[in-house]
């Protein structure tokens, strides 16, 4: 599975994005949750990064 995520996911709206938009797939981030993708999903691939909007996640990994 490929998690590219969307801009909305990167902002932590909790919406799973799709397509190579270069941001992240957030899961309730910004509300103290955690998910895939940091605020800037282009930073690092497959490595755990802190989410700028709260929680933990992985920036854009394949």
From Swiss-Prot:
Superkingdom of this entry's organism? Eukaryota
**Keyword terms, alphabetized:** Keratin, Repeat
User: Which tissues does the record link to its expression?
Assistant: Expressed in skin during two hair growth cycles. Expression restricted to the cortical cells of hair follicles, appearing first in the cortical cells processing the flat nuclei located a few cells above the dermal papilla.
User: Which Pfam families does this entry report, sorted A to Z?
Assistant: KRTAP
Residues crossing the lipid bilayer are none
Q: Where is this region: 14 X 2 AA repeats of G-[YCGS]?
A: 5-56
Per the record, its GO cellular-component terms are:
cytosol; intermediate filament
- What's this protein's family per the entry? Belongs to the KRTAP type 19 family.
Description of how the protein assembles with itself and partners: Interacts with hair keratins.
Q: What does this protein do?
A: In the hair cortex, hair keratin intermediate filaments are embedded in an interfilamentous matrix, consisting of hair keratin-associated proteins (KRTAP), which are essential for the formation of a rigid and resistant hair shaft through their extensive disulfide bond cross-linking with abundant cysteine residues of hair keratins. The matrix proteins include the high-sulfur and high-glycine-tyrosine keratins.
Question: What is the name attached to this protein's record?
Answer: Keratin-associated protein 19-5
Its gene is: Krtap19-5
């Amino acid at each position: 599975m490929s998690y590219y995520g969307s801009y909305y996911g990167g902002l932590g709206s909790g919406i799973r994005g799709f397509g190579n938009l270069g941001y992240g797939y957030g899961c309730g981030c910004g509300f103290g949750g955690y998910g895939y993708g940091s605020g800037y999903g282009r930073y690092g691939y497959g490595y755990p990064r802190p989410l700028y909007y709260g929680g933990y996640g992985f920036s854009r990994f394949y």
